[in-house]
Amino acid sequence: MARRGKKKGRPISGWVIFDKPKGMGSTEAVSKIKWLFNAEKAGHAGTLDPLASGMLPIALGEATKTVPYVMDGTKIYRFTVSWGEERSTDDLEGVATKTSDNRPSRADVEALLPNYTGVISQVPPQFSAIKIDGERAYDLAREGETVEIPSREVEIDRLEIVGIPDADRTEFEVECSKGTYVRSLARDMGRDLGCYGHISELRRIEVAPFTEEDAVTLAELEQAWPPLPPKDEDGNVVEPTPRRDFSAIDALVIDTGAALDCLPQVPLTDDQAQRVRLGNPVILRGRDAPLEADEACVTTRGKLLAIGYIEHGQFKPKRVFTTG
């Protein structure tokens, strides 16, 4: 039997709420964060387009097990729609496909907003990660194919105007569900207003349960990053190699359990925690312990231990974390 290779990197776990700069792709951002923390494992909770900036929650280590909970969270975006052009990508990156000299008034736009709140039907952009017969829509679009992307239901909790810099642009803020394409929102509003439109600025400012206050910039991360061991003229590490101190950058990591604010959380005793670590159910004690829950998590000494469900006052683990 082949021996498994040793994992490279540190077994650090938690969330880094990265303030992604414009021009950086989501995959590139994950690779950068993984390298800065020298982490064994990393992944993000929801793609952010390269032309967009703002919050990209990145999970390290065991926190990758909680990614689905963050992906399901409500998102808030601030964005600018430039009127007068519809573009192939529905943002600045594409070429103009339709143009108009019409420009909407504030009253025109405000009258339209109720049509875009609540549960609405939306067709994702041609340039999107949606799979069509096993292929990404953006790959097909780059090959010149026009694909039929089925509409999907999304939920818009709030959509409002936050600024009008000039007649050509309107600034909005939207609070929406997972799967909402803000580019499609701009495209559809432009069509309904008879003037066409595309996204010219896009920033994500919240991914529940995390807020903009949790975000850290690349500059802040690099400032806290421990330098690599010194090398001589031949590129060899100078001996003895000093141990790298990651404490400053690790202080920017948010606890794994923060992603599970939507779930009931129950603290366990040390004995109960040991049983759960072995995959066994435990009876929950205390007046406040829930009797039933489709999903819940348990903690030990303030650290997340497991996700599972509660049935007749008994917690049954489904996913156990090594950090607890």
From Swiss-Prot:
GO molecular function: RNA binding; tRNA pseudouridine(55) synthase activity
InterPro entries per the UniProt record, alphabetical: PsdUridine_synth_cat_dom_sf, PsdUridine_synth_N, tRNA_psdUridine_synth_TruB, tRNA_sdUridine_synth_fam1_C, TruB_C
Protein's GO biological process: mRNA pseudouridine synthesis; tRNA pseudouridine synthesis
Segments passing through the bilayer: none
Enzyme's top EC category: isomerase
Keyword tRNA processing attributed: yes
Domain of life per record: Bacteria
UniProt keyword annotation of Metal-binding present: no
Reactions accelerated catalytically: uridine(55) in tRNA = pseudouridine(55) in tRNA
UniProt keywords, alphabetically: Isomerase, tRNA processing
Positions annotated as active site in the UniProt record: 49
CDD domains attached to this UniProt entry: PseudoU_synth_EcTruB
Known EC number: 5.4.99.25
Family: Belongs to the pseudouridine synthase TruB family. Type 1 subfamily.
NCBIfam families for the chain: TruB
Function (record text): Responsible for synthesis of pseudouridine from uracil-55 in the psi GC loop of transfer RNAs.
Protein's recorded name: tRNA pseudouridine synthase B
Organism listed in the record: Brucella anthropi (strain ATCC 49188 / DSM 6882 / CCUG 24695 / JCM 21032 / LMG 3331 / NBRC 15819 / NCTC 12168 / Alc 37) (Ochrobactrum anthropi)
